[in-house]
Amino acid sequence: MILRRVTEALEAYKNGEMLIVMDDEDRENEGDLVLAGIFSTPEKINFMATHARGLICVSLTKDLANKFELPPMVSVNDSNHETAFTVSIDAKEAKTGISAFERHLTIELLCKDTTKPSDFVRPGHIFPLIAKDGGVLARTGHTEASVDLCKLAGLKPVSVICEIMKEDGSMARRGDKFLSDFAIKHNLKTLYVSDLISYRLENESLLKMFCQEEREFLKHQTQCYTFLDHQQKNHYAFKFKGAKTHDLAPLVRFHPIKEDFDFLTTGAFEAFFKALEYLKREGGYLIFMNTHSEQNNIVKDFGIGALVLKNLGVKDFRLLSSCEDRQYKALSGFGLKLVETISL
């Protein structure tokens, strides 16, 4: 079923059709219209504005954002899902920039190899979004899903996305009859972010385990697993054996580290040592993820952590969490189930 949904969606996408892409109910729980940027037309942009009603954005890779000199919209991103907005833009030759034609013109420029940063003015009416390297395997958002679709379809990694709102202005949620009726009415295929995660996991991997050894960690004997990701960064999992070990649903604690394995200055210091006591007593996994941000002392890319758990053969797990942690969402595509959250 998943393979069929993905292959049919990719075929439609590479033929210039829009898709409805939905994320998990425990995340944004939204349906977005998604269109490959190279197939943008004024008519399709008008359709998004008229029928989807949300904010029209353009997802693209970090390389393209750098090429067009599109810096982040803010220096510290503290939005709920850390959506990576850049400064907004218009095509330089646009008048107001808001018409469907002029928004299409801006999108068209983002898709051309010859476009220069000076071809845009800032701010504007198109909102670029930078997709995480690694796509949905690094961050389970519509931004990454739309760029992944372009890459899987062999298209330039620029995608137009727009949230779908109901006629009363409320968001169209996954499971709403509105979205299924919308898809039927406009003859649109539907795809889930979890479908893309499953599809990519079947065909590629961002993570490889290259070392497994017994190692003492803070005066406790553990099994240490070392992983290398697609950016040549190391991530580590320490398995603790406790008196009350639950192999079917082990305890898991995620914690950020810096390149030099510095884990004591990356935030959640008190919670870290509380988690350590749980792990020593009950067993489980302490996973160090090399995704630390100097601006926000939190683990930002849960996708890597999910891949570590998947590589370790974990399916169900119990999360050791603290108020400094953000929620871990969109797990279904990784074959994981969070069965309990233990507050620290």
Curated annotation (Swiss-Prot):
Alphabetized GO MF terms: 3,4-dihydroxy-2-butanone-4-phosphate synthase activity; GTP cyclohydrolase II activity; magnesium ion binding; manganese ion binding
Pfam families found in the cross-reference section: DHBP_synthase, GTP_cyclohydro2
Tagged with keyword Nucleotide-binding: no
Annotated site (Essential for catalytic activity): 125, 163
Amino-acid positions noted as binding Mg(2+) 2 in the UniProt annotation, renumbered to this chain: 28, 142
Cofactor(s) it depends on: Mg(2+); Mn(2+)
Disulfide bonds: none
Binding positions (Mg(2+) 1): 28
Family, as annotated: In the N-terminal section; belongs to the DHBP synthase family. In the C-terminal section; belongs to the GTP cyclohydrolase II family.
Function: Catalyzes the conversion of D-ribulose 5-phosphate to formate and 3,4-dihydroxy-2-butanone 4-phosphate.
Protein name, per record: 3,4-dihydroxy-2-butanone 4-phosphate synthase
Gene source species: Helicobacter pylori (strain J99 / ATCC 700824) (Campylobacter pylori J99)
Gene responsible for this protein: ribB
